[in-house]
């Protein structure tokens, strides 16, 4: 939210384009470096003179545009009844080790350290 407000204030002098930006909007997608090269999910980007660019000579750098962190951020917070929740990432071979998350406080949103899913205790 703060980033969107700062962005809105910086662009405010340019008129209607800045005012049409929704507050709280989050930009998803692939970032592009000043050289025009796509930035990967790990922030990997090389300078023009970097020797590691040799692997892309004669072919295009392929970047998956669906970053996992962006996909997880779109997931809503899960409301649960219990005070302690166990997250195993979906179970089976595709999951992760089972972790237990305490949801003691009313305002606390517990986040799984492996998969990033968020949980909140529903108080009745």
Swiss-Prot record:
Mammalian complex I is composed of 45 different subunits. This is a component of the iron-sulfur (IP) fragment of the enzyme. GO terms for biological process: mitochondrial electron transport, NADH to ubiquinone. It is a peripheral membrane protein. Keywords: Acetylation, Electron transport, Membrane, Mitochondrion, Mitochondrion inner membrane, Respiratory chain, Transit peptide, Transport. GO terms for cellular component: mitochondrial inner membrane; respiratory chain complex I. It is found in: Mitochondrion inner membrane. Pfam families: zf-CHCC. The modification N6-acetyllysine is found at residue 98. The keyword rRNA-binding does not apply. Belongs to the complex I NDUFS6 subunit family. Residues 1-28 form a transit peptide. The keyword Disulfide bond does not apply. Accessory subunit of the mitochondrial membrane respiratory chain NADH dehydrogenase (Complex I), that is believed not to be involved in catalysis. Complex I functions in the transfer of electrons from NADH to the respiratory chain. The immediate electron acceptor for the enzyme is believed to be ubiquinone. This is NADH dehydrogenase [ubiquinone] iron-sulfur protein 6, mitochondrial. It comes from Pongo pygmaeus (Bornean orangutan). InterPro entries: NDUFS6, Znf_CHCC.
């Amino acid at each position: 939210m703060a980033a969107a407000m700062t962005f809105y204030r910086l662009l405010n002098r340019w008129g209607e384009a800045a005012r049409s930006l929704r507050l709280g909007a989050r930009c998803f997608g692939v970032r592009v470096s000043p050289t025009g090269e796509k930035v990967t999910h790990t922030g990997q980007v090389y300078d023009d003179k970097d020797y590691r660019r040799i692997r892309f000579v004669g072919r295009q750098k392929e970047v998956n545009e669906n970053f996992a962190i962006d996909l997880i951020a779109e997931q809503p917070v899960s409301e649960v009844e219990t005070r302690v929740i166990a997250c195993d990432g979906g179970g089976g071979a595709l999951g992760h080790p089972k972790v237990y998350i305490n949801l003691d406080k009313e305002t606390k949103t517990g986040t799984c350290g492996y998969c990033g899913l968020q949980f909140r205790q529903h108080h009745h």
